[in-house]
Amino acid sequence: LTAPEAEKYMQPKNPCVVTGLPVRGELINADREFSRAELGVDERPVILSMGGSLGARVINNAVTQLIEERYERKDCYFLHATGKAGVGMFDVIEKEKNINLAENKHIMLREYINDMHRRMAAADLVICRAGASSLSELQALGKASILVPSPNVSENHQFHNAMALVNKGAA
């Protein structure tokens, strides 16, 4: 099993073994300082947010609001992956919210992040869905997180995934 909480849903003939979920070696070996330098950030906190490759409207909208409320302070960096469905967020930020992304280097929007292991290493806070792989990566890196479980998954499993971390004080 990946988490001890899953055992109550099993009907094993033999005892269950909690092994966790393996994570990529490149994630474990990603260097925080190198990753931050590569990203071009100083000591200010980095908030990494994402809703998956397709995007998540609720996360994109919340991050848009967060950026609008905080961008003038320039006290942190925002690195957000909009996903395929969220590419319109660029126009919302620039045209509707009147925030010039070229002038605000502390706001970094991408459709997709190809080198997530380095971006996670650079981050101080991660806002994301509560899929099993994402949670394993957050735990492996010891990252502070705000989890937004998807309501569109079978048996509400992302909620249960998130609660396993919340109950341990890890999210």
Regions found by a protein language model. Name each.
Residues 116-157:
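A donor-sugar binding/catalytic signature common to diverse glycosyltransferases
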Residues 32-34, 40-125, 159-163, 167:
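Donor-nucleotide binding loops and adjacent catalytic segments primarily
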Residues 4-6, 22-24, 112, 132, ...:
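Short, acidic/turn-prone active-site loops that include or flank metal/cofactor-
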Residues 3-12, 134, 155-162:
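Short, glycine/polar-rich helix-capping loops at beta-to-alpha or helix-loop-helix junctions
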Residues 1-32:
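Active-site-proximal region of nucleotide-activated glycan assembly enzymes
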Residues 6-16, 90-91, 119, 138:
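Short loop/helix-cap segments at secondary-structure boundaries that form the rim of catalytic
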Residues 11-14, 74, 103, 141-142, ...:
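Short, structured coil segments at secondary-structure junctions
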